[in-house]
Each structure stands twice: as structure tokens, then as C-alpha cells.
Amino acid sequence: MQNRPPTQQWITVLLVLTAVVLVTACQPTGEPPVVPTDSTSQVETSVELTQPAPESTPTRLAPTATPAYLVPLAELNGQEIIFSHPWSGETADWIDQMVDSFNQSNEWGIHMMVRRAGSSMALADRVKGGNLAADYPQVVAAPSEHLLSWLEYGNLALPLNELIADPYFGLTEQQRADIPLVFWQQDQSGGNQVGIPAQRDMPVIFYNETWAAELGFAEPPTTADDFKAQACAAAFVNSHDRFAANDGTGGWIVNTDGLVVYSWLKSFGLKDELAGSPLQFHYDQPVTQTTFAFVRSMVDEGCAWFSRTTASNEYFANRQALFYTGNLTDLPLQAKTNTRLESQDSWTILPFPDGNRPVTVVSGLSYGVLRSSAAQETAAWLFVRWMSQPENSAKLLAVGGGLPVSTAAAELARTQMDSNPQWVLAQQWMPTMQSAPPVAGWRIARFVLQDAFWQSLQSFVTLEDFPLILEQLDATIVEVQAQQGQ
């Protein structure tokens, strides 16, 4: 049997390999499309959207002249616009229906064509392919960090400030005020608003209340120590019952997703992870080492386990996990799984344990307009504005789940939301909700963070290796960003 390489060399090799993969998957986009001199891309944006307006404006009559940053409306007739998104299943089917409805009802003669990318990374690859491709989109629904990247590194995304604030073709002040400030800020860079929130989601902890009560726990955990105690109790029961098949299960299913790791870090008190000029990630902090060590102790003691499949919802329904970490959009799937597997257990969702306040971290998809011709940009914006109307946002919320992106959308979806106790619970966490890092570099940093966390949980890595892992974590993020010109 071969001896493994020294730990420092091994960690460095893994992080370098991670950097290579990320450079391949996240290469900067190609040359930006050629934009006519009269396009909206030539207009300097000046509207600040970080402060919501206090009240709505009255309905106005149609203008007699087209604003300078728009095109004559007659030029919109016959414009064919491609809308690409990462949704699938029922949500993608609903998007198809909405696009068809827009095509039939819009007064400008705009024709939208929808393209299902399949995933956010596939969509990024499509944009990276350049505007000469036949399926290159003019409007997208994409993660905020991707929109920010296309704005800052490639000049592919169009700032929307002027369009949003236009008194006739923009969003009303009330519509802007209805969208939570934290959602607006996720799509901002240097005063430019590059996106309109479409769907927001967050990692949550699924928790089996019935099983926990049988284990002797009357209340859900509110601290990390409580969380570990309950997970260990569930693991002990499964390892000492008469069924050998469930040995090694029962606690928390390990989830190394970057946003889940970031949520754990925030629950342990991570601060100032973005600092400097330009902003850089700083995860090499004592709190990160403490967080990694806590989860590692759960793994070492058998209270957290790596699942063989991605079906955490089924493990949960079968009492092979007291906890697992999923997304708010997974609520319908878990309900259907419990019904299918005939589980009678009561379950709920929890924020990440902090002890003082609920810790939740929100991210998601936003509508964005990619640079093209002036007529295409205007047509794309009018579709985004239509999709962002409260009634359409409410429909997307009802179909795709997640958090309401505006107060008006929440009110319109109130009946369905109130029928789901877990959904109602999530709304109560809105006041303390935190944002995923609202910077373009998060699309890189989240995967490097994920890899470093995974390394810290391996049996051949010792606690003494953690400082090196964290040092390499920050260095690798900087290295990959530099390779991509960021």
C-alpha cells in the first residue's frame, strides 16, 4: 500500500485541482456584443435604488415621445427575443405558459422564445458562448452573482436603473418599495442595478418533530450544542436497534454545498468575510476553524453521516436522518415524499442554530437583460417588467416556491402560503434574513469554500491541518479570480 503524501502537499494539490476545475467552468465570457451608439448601453445610469420609495405614484397616460434610452415603440413590432432560464419541471412548464401569454397579449408585437438551459451553470456556458450563437439569449433568469459577473467582467449585462425608474415603462415607486432592500442589493454593483428579483430561496434545516419527541426532546435545537445532542441521540438509536441496515445513520446528513457552509459560518458568528479594496474574501478566521471543527466532531462521533445518494428527503421520511439541510423550495417535495412513503411523522424547518436569533441566508435568481441592439434591449426589458408584476411574481411563488420577492406578491399568494405552516414559519425569519455575498466573486468563492469544508471532514485530515486549509482557501479564491481577470 502506498503512503499518502504529506498533508500540506495533499491539501495544496486538491485546492489547485479545484482552481483548475473552476477556471474551466467559470471562464470569463467572450467578447461583448456590438451595441449601436444609440443603445441604452451608452446611457450613464444615475438612479439610486438602494432606498425604496415610500409610496406609489398615480397611473399615468402613455407618453407622446419615447425616452432617449428607449427606441421608437414601432421598432418593437416583430422583435424576436430569447429568454433563457435554469428552471425545470412544473416551474419550467409554467414559464412556457407565461411566455405564451405575453406573446398573445403584449401590445408591441414582441415575440418571446423560451429556452430551458437546464441549470445555472449551463446557462452561464450559453452566455459564455457569445452573442453569435443561435440560442444566445437577450433576457435571462440567473443567479445574482452571475449577473454581477456579466456586468463587471465582460460588459455583457445591461444596467437597468433608467428603465426601472422610467415613469411610463418602469416599475412604480410602490412596486420598488415592495421589494425588500436585501433583495435589491443582491443585484447591485457600483450603483448599477443589473437584476430584478425573480425567485429567492434559502437553505433550511428539515427536522422530524415526532421522532425528536420520542427521543426525549420537547423543543427544537436553538444552539449548535443542542443540535449536536439531538443528532447524536438519533444516531445512537439507529445504531442500537434491531435493524442493521440503518446503522451509521440517524443524525444529520452532511451537506457541503457552499451556501450551506456559509450559513453555518454565519450561525457561528462569521463577520468581515468581505473586506479590502477591492473586496476580497477572508475566511481564514478563528470562527471558520471553530465551525469546521464542530461539524468534524459530529462526523467523527457518528452524529453526522455522508449519504450514498442525493435522496435526503427519503432518508428523512424513513427516519434515517433526524435532520437534513435542503432549500425552502424543497417543501413540496418533502411533503410528497412523506405521503408516498406513508410517514405519519410531523416535521418542520429550522434556521441555522445561533442561540439568539434565527440565521438564514438568502440567494436566488433575478431577471437580467443582456446587451444586444437597442430594440432588443427595450423589448427584453418590457418582458422583464411584465414578469415582475405582482400577480406574475405571485404565480411563480405558488409554482416554484421560495420566498415572496415583494409584499404585493406575498399578499396575492397569501391563501396558499397560509395553508403551509412551514412556509408561514419561513416568513417570520424575514426581518433577520442575511444575504449571500452580493459580489460577482461569490460564484467562485462558494465552490472553493465547499471544497475546503469537504477536506476538513476527511478522516485523514487532522485538526492541526485546518489552519493550512483556511490559508489555502483564501489564497485559492484570489488565484482563481486573478486567472479570470477579476
What are these regions, as identified by a protein language model?
Residues 177, 347-350, 398-451:
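Long, aromatic- and glycine/proline-rich binding clefts that accommodate carbohydrate-like moieties
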Residues 230-232, 265, 276-307, 352:
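Glycine-centered hinge/linker elements that transmit conformational signals in sensory
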Residues 63, 67-73, 144-202, 344-351, ...:
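Hinge/lid segment of periplasmic solute-binding proteins
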Residues 49, 213, 431-486:
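Conserved C-terminal helix/tail region of periplasmic/extracytoplasmic solute-binding proteins
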Residues 213-215, 289, 297-304, 338-404, ...:
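Extracytoplasmic/periplasmic substrate-recognition and gating elements
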Residues 101, 105-178, 213-216, 315, ...:
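Extracytoplasmic "Venus flytrap"/periplasmic binding protein-like
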Residues 185-198, 203, 228-280, 321:
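Extracytoplasmic/periplasmic solute-binding protein
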Residues 16-20, 26-75:
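Ser/Thr-rich, Proline-interspersed low-complexity disordered segments
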